[in-house]
């Protein structure tokens, strides 16, 4: 029988920052509705006798304590006993990540899983943006040196990005074509993204939260002095902002596409009214930061849309 249990598949609790973490923010909201929170790491997911189990802990989150969680009970839980499962571990989107989507996929008709594991597997966070290239800065996806060299000739400054990392990791701004560096970068990452640098990033990007196919909110993230990276983990500062008419139009289009793909919760980013190509569906963040700025609780919206 299904119980009022929300399972969270996430990174080690020691990696979570209660001041900003979206997983904790979502868990705190739903535990106030008398749901139990079961937390486990991806490596503790197993298939035993055709049933899906996870070894983890029933926990209680508390924002007011120095230690922000209390372990109530360790347990091996049959995940079909849950009402919801949140896939919340950070990328890299590697074989272990993919394996968990195959395992959870087998029970998605019995338990509501956010985001849908099949959809997470099918939607590469950066490659999916190929559908929306007309709304992006000049961008190519390639590991062909000649094509990359041509791209540099047409664009003064170029941002190089890996396809399967996250959080602004290993992103570089090049003022000119550097064969040695680019060869090394390709050897490490295979296909890479080359994108025209948009100088207005110094004013900040915009992170748009999409919930159940609709625009739910937006914040701006301003890079720290001397940086072009707008990720909070790289020292950027969050501020209130609004979407322009163009950004709203593009956001609605992306949101509708993602809903068709069974993506319930996502984050997309704009720089100077252009999508930057990151369509975050694995573990979208920023809801707690948005609440701190606006006092609008999108965790409440999240669970209301799920009819929890």
Predicted regions, residues:
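Extreme N-terminal starter segment of soluble prokaryotic enzymes
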Residues: 2-7
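ATP-dependent carboxylate activation and anion-phosphoryl transfer catalytic cores
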Residues: 16-19, 242-308
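Short glycine-rich anion-binding loops that position phosphate/pyrophosphate groups of nucleotides
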Residues: 12, 89-92, 163-165, 284
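Short glycine-enriched loops at secondary-structure junctions
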Residues: 117-121, 215, 221-224, 271-275
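Conserved N-proximal alpha/beta basic substrate-recognition cap immediately N-terminal to
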Residues: 14-141
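Phosphate-binding site of ATP-dependent enzymes
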Residues: 145-146, 153-156, 164-258
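A short linear hydrophobic-aromatic micro-motif
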Residues: 158-160, 192-195, 264-269
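Redox-cofactor binding/interface segments in oxidoreductases and associated redox assembly factors
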Residues: 8, 86-87, 195
């Amino acid at each position: 029988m299904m119980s009022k249990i929300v399972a969270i598949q996430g990174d080690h609790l020691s990696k979570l920052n209660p001041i900003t973490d979206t997983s904790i923010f979502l868990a705190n909201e739903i535990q106030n509705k008398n749901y139990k929170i079961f937390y486990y790491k991806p490596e503790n997911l197993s298939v035993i006798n055709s049933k899906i189990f996870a070894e983890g802990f029933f926990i209680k989150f508390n924002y007011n304590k120095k230690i922000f969680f209390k372990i109530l009970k360790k347990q091996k839980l049959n995940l079909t006993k849950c009402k919801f499962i949140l896939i919340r571990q950070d990328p890299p989107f590697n074989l272990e990540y993919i394996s968990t989507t195959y395992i959870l996929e087998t029970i998605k008709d019995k338990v509501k899983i956010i985001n849908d594991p099949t959809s997470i597997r099918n939607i590469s966070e950066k490659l999916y943006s190929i559908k929306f290239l007309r709304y992006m800065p000049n961008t190519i996806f390639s590991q062909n040196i000649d094509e990359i060299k041509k791209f540099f000739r047409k664009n003064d400054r170029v941002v190089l990005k890996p396809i399967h990392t996250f959080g602004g990791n290993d992103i570089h701004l090049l003022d000119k074509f550097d064969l040695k560096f680019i060869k090394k970068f390709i050897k490490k990452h295979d296909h890479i993204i080359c994108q025209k640098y948009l100088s207005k990033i110094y004013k900040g990007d915009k992170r748009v939260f999409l919930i159940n196919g609709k625009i739910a909110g937006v914040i701006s993230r301003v890079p720290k002095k001397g940086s072009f990276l707008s990720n909070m983990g790289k020292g950027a500062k969050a501020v209130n902002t609004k979407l322009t008419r163009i950004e709203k139009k593009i956001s609605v289009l992306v949101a509708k596409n993602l809903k068709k793909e069974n993506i319930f919760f996502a984050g997309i980013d704009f720089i100077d009214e252009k999508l930057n190509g990151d369509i975050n569906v694995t573990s979208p963040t920023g809801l707690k930061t948005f609440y701190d700025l606006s006092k609008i609780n999108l965790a409440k919206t999240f669970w209301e849309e799920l009819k929890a």
